[in-house]
Amino acid sequence: MTDNNKYRDVEIRAPRGNKLTAKSWLTEAPLRMLMNNLDPQVAENPKELVVYGGIGRAARNWACYDKIVETLTRLEDDETLLVQSGKPVGVFKTHSNAPRVLIANSNLVPHWANWEHFNELDAKGLAMYGQMTAGSWIYIGSQGIVQGTYETFVEAGRQHYGGSLKGKWVLTAGLGGMGGAQPLAATLAGACSLNIECQQSRIDFRLETRYVDEQATDLDDALARIAKYTAEGKAISIALHGNAAEILPELVKRGVRPDMVTDQTSAHDPLNGYLPAGWTWEQYRDRAQTEPAAVVKAAKQSMAVHVQAMLDFQKQGIPTFDYGNNIRQMAKEEGVANAFDFPGFVPAYIRPLFCRGVGPFRWAALSGEAEDIYKTDAKVKELIPDDAHLHRWLDMARERISFQGLPARICWVGLGLRAKLGLAFNEMVRSGELSAPVVIGRDHLDSGSVSSPNRETEAMRDGSDAVSDWPLLNALLNTAGGATWVSLHHGGGVGMGFSQHSGMVIVCDGTDEAAERIARVLTNDPGTGVMRHADAGYDIAIDCAKEQGLDLPMITG
């Protein structure tokens, strides 16, 4: 048992430069990335260890955080630290090519895999919600989801508006760690956006980091700005302080017609992440402690109203989609029988990318030097010279995205290219072109690392939406391949009982041994995504597997 204190008035920042505080870069890297997750420029509520996504934490409590830091500092390169729901529980002798850290967060036996049981365990200090990259120490701020959101909006523009979103506007809500990416992604895709958020502090943070351009004073002002900017063909993002469950029905009532509707509130967690209509945030937080069941009920009732408004927009022929927060499920449980009439974003727009192992490849400069990221940007362009779409993304990212914490970059690439880039980055460290090692990781939202029937694996061709062997195999293979740290989580994105997913991070320290590990891991990891989709019968994935020489006994053998 440990002290369950989750609050500490402290500011944490990862060390910079090339001086070690641990015994090697293989242990320095997870140490810095853990600290980076709690950097006040990165985390949503770092003093309570909350990184993003409602209550997604980096460590179970402050005593556990202290002990993780202490253990990583002394860990040898033939030892592995085991972390159980944010608590360091053991160090065991392994070998130099094994992961230095293995993490399991929020996992529950299926019958008990619900918020009620999890919240009981959390209150007792026995569990921690790791979200996806919070408890796996590879969150890089809102940039981590910007490109995926951008790709979604661009593809929606191709499907519905002839390839251009100029003069169009997106209606959405939520400006937290994930939702905060939406306004910038819409702007980069060429659209205006109206972004509803119930916490002023989150709007302030997105304005400060240039993820949102302006704040409207009220709904009338917001609509006037939208009308002006769309008429001028400008892509400007507007924040509006308010509650989506109140504002969306009002927009329907007024006959307002957005060009696209989605949502990224923290609806996955009704107790901690979704403000009921008519409530203040202070009331919500206080009553969550004293009347949790009533709070959950009120939040889900508001979600039902919110989703009904989204359905009303869809009935008007407006492209409407779920952005992976499980709000449709919550509404269905509150009596909205047709909540799933509008699709999730993955089957609607992203799955063809997943079939080729393309997903949110990301890296961070442990040096803390922005120039190291700019050099890697140039290397990506050099090694992938003919992808104009990717080059445009990198140019826009450099111009518009503010680094949060350690400088980092997100770049959606797939099987073949990930290993190529990783080996090139490792060589840049070896030659001294980069001033310190880099880490390469990804979101758990990737092609082969998640089972989530209401999000990434919704409407799989063969009906295998809920089969969760795939992320388990992904984690096992990345462990065998020698990733520097590997994580296996439950409940990220869509909440308890609705997802299982795995993550990996690998260090490029410039050594020959690192190159061997990089070649294995960055081939195998996206390879499992191609495998998973080929197994489900997707022709794009089957063709990719054959082109890339994957050995899939039932398909290519």
Curated annotation (Swiss-Prot):
Pathway: Amino-acid degradation; L-histidine degradation into L-glutamate; N-formimidoyl-L-glutamate from L-histidine: step 2/3. HAMAP family: HutU (MF_00577). Catalyzes the conversion of urocanate to 4-imidazolone-5-propionate. GO terms for molecular function: urocanate hydratase activity. This is Urocanate hydratase. It catalyses: 4-imidazolone-5-propanoate = trans-urocanate + H2O. It comes from the Bacteria. It is found in: Cytoplasm. Its cofactor is NAD(+). The active site is at 411. NAD(+) binds at residues 53-54, 131, 177-179, 197, 202, 243-244, 264-268, 274-275, 323, 493. One of its GO terms (cellular component) is cytoplasm. Keywords: Cytoplasm, Histidine metabolism, Lyase, NAD. One of its GO terms (biological process) is L-histidine catabolic process to glutamate and formate. It is an enzyme of class 4 (lyase). Belongs to the urocanase family. Disulfide bonds: none annotated. Binds 1 NAD(+) per subunit. Its EC number is 4.2.1.49. InterPro entries: Urocanase, Urocanase-like, Urocanase_C, Urocanase_central_sf, Urocanase_CS, Urocanase_N, Urocanase_Rossmann-like, Urocanase_sf.
